[in-house]
Regions:
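N-terminal pre-domain segments of enzymes
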Residues: 1-51, 59
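Stable alpha-helical elements in mature extracytoplasmic
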Residues: 3-10, 53-60, 82, 144-152, ...
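Surface-exposed patches in mature extracellular/periplasmic domains of secreted proteins
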Residues: 22-27, 71-78, 162-167
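A non-catalytic alpha/beta surface segment that caps or lines the substrate-entry region
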Residues: 49-96, 101
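Active-site/substrate-binding loop(s) of hydrolase catalytic cores
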Residues: 92-97, 102-219
Length: 219
């Protein structure tokens, strides 16, 4: 793939320790059809002093899915306690996504081995594809993963290296951009407040949501 050299320079600039840099992340592929996070959001993932609200995470994934047949977006029928959307993103090659219902069926059958003979299980395993689930921000102070997952989804959708092509061909990647959407946005609020008000006290813990101090949407 051609490289986005300007984005690659930002990766080098923003990476704080050399041991974080590997050949998998020290560059960004360039696409004339599929937008990078910077093209949609106006800044590169990992930009210092910048966190992204869930609505903007979702805006990026929707544009990614609109531009790439390797990406699909699903939204849960239920909203969070505070009324926010809850999104799931899938990345795989086009052939796998075309057979998504079949792969879901196989995975569901394999989940209960009591109903399968060994031979049936082996047949299903040979036909099926594993689902790999990456979730961001299980706890709201975990601020990095929702940012990073946007870049990971873009890499998986665009890059044509043998390593990435092998991933797309042989598995279906599920991404939850932010598992704890309410706390994520409140954490971004808090971070922006502290940036704008250096030295002032942090808002009290009651600021955090409708449950006692912490809402993980898991009750």
């Amino acid at each position: 793939s051609p490289l986005d050299t300007a984005y690659g320079a930002k990766i080098a600039e923003y990476t704080t320790e050399k041991y974080f840099m590997t050949e998998l992340v020290d560059h960004l592929p360039l696409s004339d059809k599929v937008p990078s996070p910077q093209k949609v959001l106006g800044y590169a993932v990992g930009t210092p002093n910048k966190l992204t609200y869930t609505k903007d995470l979702y805006r990026y994934y929707r544009e990614l899915a609109a531009a790439s047949p390797r990406v699909r977006v699903f939204v849960a029928p239920e909203k969070s306690e505070e009324g926010r959307e809850q999104m799931l993103v899938l990345v795989s090659d086009e052939a796998n996504l075309a057979k998504l219902d079949r792969y879901k069926e196989i995975t569901a059958k394999l989940a209960d081995p009591r109903k399968l003979s060994d031979a049936e299980a082996h047949t299903l395993i040979a036909e099926g594809k594993p689902f790999y689930w990456a979730s961001g921000s299980i706890h709201s102070p975990e601020t990095g993963s929702p940012e990073m997952l946007m870049e990971m989804a873009y890499r998986l959708a665009v890059e044509d290296s043998p390593f990435i092509e092998d991933i797309r061909k042989n598995m279906i990647i599920m991404i939850t951009p932010a598992l704890e959407v309410d706390g994520r946005d409140r954490m971004v609020d808090l971070y922006n407040y502290r940036k704008a008000n250096p030295g002032k006290p942090t808002p009290p813990l009651l600021y955090w949501g409708k449950y006692v101090a912490h809402d993980n949407n898991r009750d």
